[in-house]
Regions:
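Short hydrophobic core segments
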Residues: 5-7, 110, 125-135, 168-169, ...
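A conserved FAD-binding loop/helix module that cradles the flavin
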Residues: 209, 289-341, 412, 416-434
Length: 434
């Protein structure tokens, strides 16, 4: 008998497995696709690899203004091969860790027979606990027209060649990333969002800033717009367009079998499986983590949920805390947000940061929010925003006062100095802005 059977080896499942196994638990992981889940195989890793390559192309194209002349030619077959090699290397790393910790990996599709029995490849696995970590899948687009043109945020990585033009449907974080990356790699891009601004659910000023930068890069951004695909025609509002590919980026949905859950008596809704703060379902020995739990579709949240579930299975009381979840969007420039965007706020422009000027990219800003002398939230738009947000996340988590960060000496010249200057601005003591 296993102590735990985990279904799914994505960032939730594999982290949970390792957290359990290193404490001596007998763990079996069932995975029907590749190790690392959507994040490694079809999400975070391949998109960020392409984002890095797009950044190289962008810098090479802008190098002439710095006195560096170069001709840019993209061989997508090589780029794609290197991307897949990176994915394979990281997935292999997870497999290596499984062997190191004695975690049994079974390839196949799991069928949950009871809360103590899982069937895989006609073999029954008996277990004390079950962890569901089956992730999510892209939402489909309600159209039967032009199937040869439509790709999802998963299937786009299977394309052998870069399309000349792409219509991206959905201006959330995934749609904005793909629009930016594909544009950087030379594709003509239309980006359509039904809501008033890009990145719906986030402060409008952020979506507006990204829209401005995208338009400057030549992307056709259409917020508060509708799309219709019918009779072999693609209409944005009343305008007909003819993209080579149509990328559907309208979100994801939990990947579970509702009939199976109902038979087991596990509570769920359209957002995901219902869990408590310990990641338990209504069946005390069945846990749900990652996208399937429906809280956040973020790999770093999934991994943390995996650790929390593991600790509770091991008898160490642990609860999820979602108050300081960083949210990053890998556009050009990047966006990073953490905490509450409310209270007294001040903004510091990246153009006043020395390192941003050295990098040749001064777009964006750092905006900080405080209440009763405690840092509440931070918004960063700019080069390497995803790297800077970690310090803000820690400061908010520890309930630090702005002066606690200000009185910490920061290296110069660095981008995090912009965070310090923004904090100084809260009481009018900024050094590098008026």
């Amino acid at each position: 008998m296993y102590d735990v059977v985990i279904i799914g080896a994505g960032p939730a499942g594999y982290v949970c497995a390792i957290s359990l196994a290193r404490q001596g638990a007998k763990v079996c992981v069932v995975e029907k696709n590749g190790l690392g889940g959507t994040c490694t195989q079809k999400g975070c890793i391949p998109t960020k690899y392409l984002h890095s390559m797009g950044n190289i192309v962008r810098k090479a194209k802008s190098a002439k203004k710095f006195g560096i002349n170069s001709n840019i030619e993209i061989d997508y077959s090589i780029l794609s091969s290197k991307m897949k090699s990176t994915v394979s290397k990281l997935a292999s790393g997870i497999g290596f860790l499984f062997k190191e910790y004695g975690i049994e990996l079974v390839n196949g599709e799991a069928i949950i027979k009871s809360q103590n029995h899982v069937i895989v490849n006609d073999k029954t696995l008996e277990t004390k606990n079950i962890v569901l970590a089956t992730g999510s899948k892209p939402k489909s687009f309600p159209s039967e027209s032009l199937p040869e043109k439509i790709v999802s945020t998963d299937s786009i990585f299977d394309l052998e060649d870069l399309p000349e033009s792409v219509l991206v449907v959905g201006g959330g974080y995934s749609g904005c990333e793909f629009a930016s990356i594909l544009n950087a790699l030379g594709c003509k891009i239309w980006l359509v969002e039904m809501e008033d601004s890009l990145l719906p659910g986030q402060p409008k000023e952020i979506g507006d800033a990204i829209e401005k930068y995208m338009k400057l890069d030549g992307i056709s951004v259409m917020a508060k717009s509708s799309i219709k695909i019918d009779n072999e025609k693609v209409m944005i509002n009343e305008e007909e367009v003819n993209p080579e590919k149509i990328l559907i980026s309208t979100g994801r949905k939990p990947n579970f079998n509702t009939d199976e859950l109902d038979k087991l008596g596990i509570a769920w809704n359209d957002d995901g499986i219902k869990v408590n703060e310990c990641m338990q379902t209504n069946l005390s020995n069945v846990y749900a983590i990652g996208d399937i739990a429906g809280k956040y579709e973020l790999a770093h949240v999934a991994s943390y949920q995996g650790e929390v579930a593991a600790q509770n299975i091991l008898g160490e009381k642990s609860a999820m805390d979602y108050s300081t979840v960083p949210f990053c969007v890998f556009t050009y420039p990047e966006v990073a947000i953490v905490g509450k965007c409310e209270g007294n706020s001040k903004e510091f422009p990246m153009i006043a940061n020395a390192k941003a000027n050295c990098l040749g990219d001064t777009r964006g800003f750092v905006k900080v929010f405080e209440e009763n002398g405690i840092l509440q939230g931070t918004v960063i738009v700019g080069e390497h925003a995803s790297e800077i947000i970690g310090e803000a996340t820690l400061a908010i988590k520890l309930k630090l006062k702005p002066k606690d960060v200000i009185e910490t000496i920061h290296a110069h010249p660095t981008l995090p100095e912009a965070f310090v200057d923004a904090l100084r601005s809260l009481d009018g003591k900024s050094i590098h802005s008026s």
